[in-house]
Amino acid sequence: MSSSDRDIIDIESGEEDLYSDGGNDIIDIESGEEDLYSDGGNVSDDYNPVDDTISRSEKSYVVVKEEDILKLQRDDIEQVSTVLSVSQVESIVLLLHYHWCVSKLEDEWFTDEERIRKTVGILKEPVVDVNGTEVDIQCGICFESYTRKEIARVSCGHPYCKTCWTGYITTKIEDGPGCLRVKCPEPSCYAVVGQDMIDEVTEKKDKDKYYRYFLRSYVEDGKKMKWCPSPGCEYAVEFGVNGSSSYDVSCLCSYKFCWNCCEDAHSPVDCETVSKWLLKNKDESENMNWILAKTKPCPKCKRPIEKNTGCNHMSCSAPCRHYFCWACLQPLSDHKACNAFKADNEDETKRKRAKDAIDRYTHFYERWAFNQSSRLKAMSDLEKWQSVELKQLSDIQSTPETQLSFTVDAWLQIIECRRVLKWTYAYGYYILSQERNKRVFARTFSLSCCSAEAENGLERLHHCAEEELKQFIGKIEDPSKNFGELRAKLIDLTKATKTYFENLVKALENGLVDVAYNESQSIEEPESFTKRSKTRKIKTLI
């Protein structure tokens, strides 16, 4: 089965890994030396793309460990070697050239084998005589004479001593992943250097580095896998599309990211909006907007001047020294009063527009940044809760930690909701940046209503987890506090908040065209938290 046709397995965060932890004592394919590939090891032999398949109504992806990547590589190498009747070393060269796309390789090979051989550097016959009778052979690099055993060649037959081969290949490995496609040292020769030569002449540390590049090439050169961007994580994610617009995936290291752009998970906001927003946060253009909004140019030298006192009599700094009125920008020497109405000139209009743009951007950015910092704080609180405080609560309440998992669920829900809420402000910023028409105002109103409901629910949940729950941790417990009531309250708030945000995400994914909580979607809140109606209805203006 080719890599391009391989099925993808669905995975949900928190479930057990789909692969076994088989041994990784791997034997070289041909030489028998230790290497990354073998039939002798049992690296994830239970890997089965059919097992544990979840409904295709959700996005399909699978988190893959390095040993599983090795097995997938080995399977592709063996398939190509069998189908094309070439050695496994040549299979590796071909797969690297075709970026591990087995189907494309096989199609083009059977269409024009000779052209493919020449393109990748696999020669059928050497270009120099390798069957001579001379005892000593001159190295093509150092020009010293060596015995046949001290000389090594690739398919072209050009002779080089093993010492020169070692230096040549080691230099290529130190240069980076380009070492996977090393050619013969002869400048005019296009013959490729295979893994058999790498194994023969390189030291262990260089060989390990080479095979590290080789392993990573399966993910980085292909189109279906990407490495988890979390620092230190060695998992990759294989992805398949089933019609959903979200690319968010959850790695086994617990890091959630967008598979498409490799930024933090940002559903339901699309990658383009995220890219524009992050770029805007770094863009120096906001500095120019601030200058336009908060300063006026000196009428004489045109340098921007910020007014920092109450008086309208302004003096430009040296060497200009121009005196003028801040209100009307006229020289003070012939200035009487500037209380007559004057229509805004072009510069004043620009300043007002710049100030409006800054105020609008600041409004959304502050809320985006607040939810980001709140999310990071919640992640820190969860870590502290799981490592210290959960055990304290378990001891105080004489309850197993497994029965207190609802507290962890609450914190996880808070973290996820902060993430979603953060990106709604980036989404909202670009809605208001569009043409002012009825549809845009309707979408803005819908977003405001949905996010307000969700944010209010989140704040109540966050307060309960951060303040009320922690009141039950300490050396002395207030007997007036009823932990059972808090348990029910926290569970209800977690469910209600989850429903709010599911509706918000659905509304954003649908473009806020159909935003309504009907009777079947009513959200019931704990009576202790609100006196308002338990059923809310939101309708758009569209």
Swiss-Prot record:
Superkingdom of source: Eukaryota
E.C. code: 2.3.2.31
Free-text cofactor note: Binds 4 Zn(2+) ions per subunit.
Residues involved in Zn(2+) 3 binding: 228, 233, 251, 253
Residues annotated as the enzyme's active site: 311
Record-listed Zn(2+) 6 binding positions: 325, 328, 335, 338
SUPFAM superfamilies, A to Z: RING/U-box
Residue stretches of biased makeup (Acidic residues): 10-19
Keywords, comma-separated and alphabetical: Metal-binding, Repeat, Transferase, Ubl conjugation pathway, Zinc, Zinc-finger
The protein's required cofactors: Zn(2+)
InterPro entries given in the database record: Ariadne, E3_UB_ligase_RBR, IBR_dom, TRIAD_supradom, Znf_RING, Znf_RING/FYVE/PHD, Znf_RING_CS
Residue span of region TRIAD supradomain: 135-342
Catalysis: reaction(s): [E2 ubiquitin-conjugating enzyme]-S-ubiquitinyl-L-cysteine + [acceptor protein]-L-lysine = [E2 ubiquitin-conjugating enzyme]-L-cysteine + [acceptor protein]-N(6)-ubiquitinyl-L-lysine
First and last residues of each zinc finger (IBR-type): 208-271
Sequence positions that bind Zn(2+) 4: 258, 261, 266, 271
PROSITE patterns: TRIAD, ZF_RING_1, ZF_RING_2
PANTHER family in the record: RBR FAMILY RING FINGER AND IBR DOMAIN-CONTAINING
Protein's job: Might act as an E3 ubiquitin-protein ligase, or as part of E3 complex, which accepts ubiquitin from specific E2 ubiquitin-conjugating enzymes and then transfers it to substrates.
UniProt-recorded name of the protein: Probable E3 ubiquitin-protein ligase ARI11
Organism this protein belongs to: Arabidopsis thaliana
The organism's taxonomic lineage, starting at the top: Eukaryota, Viridiplantae, Streptophyta, Embryophyta, Tracheophyta
Gene encoding the protein: ARI11
